[in-house]
């Protein structure tokens, strides 16, 4: 994968290198599945996870509220020679997009979400992780296929511990019943 690095006004570079281990895990799961995999990447940012999944052979729907970030992700796909891979690039509020996917009946075999602590959607929607993550997980669970491969959530919000995220996912019943208690 080739990722374009450039400093932003938020002192980010467009890449979180610590995510490479997750990208490798996604690729391993997709390649080992032996079937076509549809991935939904919410809060897709500059596309590292999207590119990893595309490179492994999955089709991806990449969603981010920032038009600039989606454009950057597309540039990263071009730099990685992945523009011929099946990817939908969507600029939208993640929760609103998932609600529409539920109405459309679209299903995904894998979900990746890396929500920010705080953000604004393209229509001025306010996102606060601690206020909105449970509802988003509840919605997103509804777009999982009958044979989901994985549901990955990354979070660096200081006020929300990994134990709280794990509790939310278990409370929603995403683990166990759908994944056979394997992950």
Which residues are covered by each model-predicted region?
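Non-catalytic substrate-recognition/targeting regions of SAM-dependent transferases
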Residues: 1-15, 24
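Conserved SAM-binding loop of SAM-dependent methyltransferases across substrates and taxa
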Residues: 46-58
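C-terminal catalytic and target-recognition region of SAM-dependent MTase-like enzymes
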Residues: 147-183
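Conserved alpha-helix/loop element of class I SAM-dependent methyltransferases that forms part
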Residues: 17-35
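Conserved SAM-binding motif I beta-strand of class I
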Residues: 59-64
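Conserved class I S-adenosyl-L-methionine
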Residues: 34-45
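Mobile active-site "lid"/loop adjacent to the S-adenosyl-L-methionine
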Residues: 67-69, 91, 109-139
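S-adenosyl-L-methionine
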Residues: 66-112
